[in-house]
C-alpha cells in the first residue's frame, strides 16, 4: 500500500496525557473534531519509516528506549503550521528532546509538537481562542516511545523509557 507508513512517537506520562487530552476535548465539546487520527495517545512524532522496515524499526525502538531516561519537557507554545490546517501545542526544543529525535533521524527542520486539531483553516481559526483560553505553560514528562502503522491505524509497540 503506497499510503501506509510507520510512525515513531514520543509518549507521555499519565498526567501529561490527561492534560493535553483535556485541552483537545474542549475542542471536541464545541464541535471542532477535525480530520486528525483519533484514539491514539497524545504524542510528539519523532520519525516516519516505510512499512517494510517494521521489524528493524521495532528493534531500534526497543534499544533506544532501553538506553534513554524519561525526561521532562516544558510546554510553552501554541502554533499553527503554514497553510493554517494544523493547530498544535509545543514544548521547548531542549537537549533531551533533540537527543531523542536524533536517535531516529536529523532534527534540523523538525518542529516538536502535539497536534490538537487538523482541519480547514476556518475551523483552525475558530479553535485557536479555545486553546488559548485552556492553555498555560506546564511541565510534562516523556516516558515512552510508540510505534504505529497508519492507514489504517495499527498499534505495533509501546516501550517505556528507563
Walk through the language-model features, giving the residues of each.
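A structured binding-face within diverse protein domains that lines the active/interaction site
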Residues: 89
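Short proline/glycine- and acidic-rich turn/helix-capping motifs at secondary-structure junctions
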Residues: 76-85, 144-155
Amino acid at each position: 500500500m503506497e499510503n501506509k507508513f510507520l510512525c515513531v512517537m514520543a509518549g507521555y506520562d499519565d498526567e501529561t496525557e490527561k492534560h493535553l487530552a483535556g485541552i483537545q476535548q474542549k475542542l471536541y465539546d464545541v464541535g471542532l473534531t477535525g480530520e486528525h487520527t483519533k484514539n491514539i495517545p497524545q504524542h510528539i512524532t519523532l520519525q516516519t519509516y516505510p512499512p517494510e522496515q517494521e521489524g528493524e524499526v521495532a528493534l531500534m525502538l526497543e534499544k533506544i528506549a532501553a538506553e534513554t531516561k524519561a525526561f521532562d519537557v516544558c510546554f510553552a507554545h501554541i502554533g499553527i503550521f503554514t497553510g493554517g490546517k494544523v493547530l498544535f501545542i509545543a514544548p521547548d526544543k531542549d537537549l533531551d528532546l533533540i537527543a531523542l529525535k536524533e536517535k531516529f533521524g536529523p532534527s534540523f527542520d523538525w518542529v516538536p509538537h502535539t497536534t490538537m486539531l487538523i482541519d480547514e483553516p476556518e475551523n483552525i481559526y475558530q479553535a485557536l481562542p479555545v486553546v488559548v483560553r485552556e492553555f498555560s505553560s506546564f511541565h510534562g514528562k516523556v516516558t515512552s516511545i510508540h510505534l504505529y502503522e497508519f492507514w489504517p491505524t495499527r498499534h505495533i509497540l509501546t516501550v517505556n523509557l528507563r
